[in-house]
């Protein structure tokens, strides 16, 4: 644990966008910066924000008879306190993370990360900001903003055809494909990119920065200089190093074609239209209150869906417990009836009508054997 920093900056950076859009390579570019620490994809903070919202509802449900509302703890403060704790934990343990990275990943996962990112850089404990490149956070930007009000988001966007081809050819470190088919790949791109574009409109260019994948590949230095200007950080030439080596490559064959006849044509058309629009139109110059309200409504809807799902799960668990108890009781009854049947059969054999016939027949045969005349010699 690193407790050397008296004041810990709470300005994390989230790299969002569709999977296979360059989120990994951009994240590791940022990790070369002397003030930025790359953390492994976390994947839990989005759902954590939703769970916090549910807990806040519970903690304020009875007005002044509930602790949070009785103590005038506002929702924004509730979220931000937890976010600050997460930030402090990450920064206080940055030295431990870099120590573990000093060699194991480069050997265990070839080509997964640039080697420069796996070594302990001088002054690592002075890195005051952390970077998370979890693509799924494209769908959780509103909740992450509540946890980390000072967070900045980089939306890296790539044309949909390239993403779909890459997704269909990518095996996630031996864990299988990201999607089952082409239809899911188009839908995944559409959902994540649409969510990021809504965040661009909702929060404006001071919070969300759009970076085209093509710009990162074709003019990397210019692209990173613009990006660091957005992040209010000085440009660091070492951040270009990871771009010299392909990482997390899906190794798409040149002759690989997309165009599955089972894929919904209207979905493909919608994705293609949005992809062209993103490539040709600039990012909105300012935040939109209407889009922000839309983000908030979507977040609240998700909270409601989670609450309903939890209620259904709780009801199913109670039903399962009740059925298990009923089954246990019926098994006991069956065992009792089987035991009674065995006792009944035993009594009937020993004392019943059948047993009398059996015993009388035996005695008659015995008496008859004594009455038979003996043969005279």
Which residues are covered by each model-predicted region?
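A conserved segment at the C-terminal end of the G1
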Residues: 24-36
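PAPS-dependent sulfotransferases, especially Golgi type II membrane carbohydrate sulfotransferases
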Residues: 1-13, 200-201, 229-376
């Amino acid at each position: 644990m690193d407790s050397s920093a008296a004041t810990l900056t709470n300005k994390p950076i989230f790299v969002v966008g569709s999977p296979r859009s360059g989120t990994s390579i951009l994240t590791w570019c940022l990790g070369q910066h002397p003030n930025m620490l790359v953390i492994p994809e976390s994947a839990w903070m989005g759902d954590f924000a939703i769970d916090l919202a549910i807990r806040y509802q519970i903690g304020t449900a009875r007005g002044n008879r509930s602790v949070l509302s009785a103590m005038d703890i506002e929702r924004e403060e509730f979220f931000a306190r937890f976010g600050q704790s997460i930030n402090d934990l990450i920064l206080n343990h940055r030295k431990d993370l870099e120590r573990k990275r000093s060699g194991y990943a480069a050997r265990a996962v070839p080509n997964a990360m640039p080697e420069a990112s796996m070594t302990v850089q001088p002054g690592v404990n002075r890195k005051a900001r952390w970077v998370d490149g979890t693509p799924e956070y494209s769908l959780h930007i509103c909740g992450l903003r509540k946890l980390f009000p000072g967070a900045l988001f980089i939306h890296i966007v790539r044309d949909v055809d390239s993403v779909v081809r890459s997704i269909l050819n990518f095996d996630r470190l031996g864990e299988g494909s990201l999607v089952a088919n082409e239809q899911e790949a188009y839908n995944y791109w559409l959902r994540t990119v649409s969510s990021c574009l809504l965040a661009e409109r909702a929060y404006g260019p001071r919070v969300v920065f759009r970076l085209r994948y093509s710009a990162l590949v074709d003019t990397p230095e210019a692209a990173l200089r613009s990006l660091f200007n957005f992040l209010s950080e000085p440009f660091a030439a070492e951040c270009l190093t990871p771009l010299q080596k392909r990482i997390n490559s899906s190794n798409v064959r040149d002759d690989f074609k997309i165009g599955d006849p089972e894929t919904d044509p209207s979905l493909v058309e919608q994705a293609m239209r949005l992809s062209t629009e993103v490539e040709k139109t600039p990012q909105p110059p300012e935040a939109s209150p209407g889009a922000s309200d839309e983000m908030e409504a979507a977040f609240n809807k998700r909270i409601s869906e989670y609450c309903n799902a939890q209620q259904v799960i709780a009801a199913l668990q109670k039903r399962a417990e009740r059925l298990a108890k009923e089954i246990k009781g019926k098994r006991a009854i069956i065992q009792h009836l089987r035991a009674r049947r065995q006792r009944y059969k035993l009594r009937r054999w020993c004392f019943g009508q059948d047993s009398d016939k059996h015993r009388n027949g035996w005695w008659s045969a015995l008496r008859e054997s004594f009455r038979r005349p003996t043969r005279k010699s």
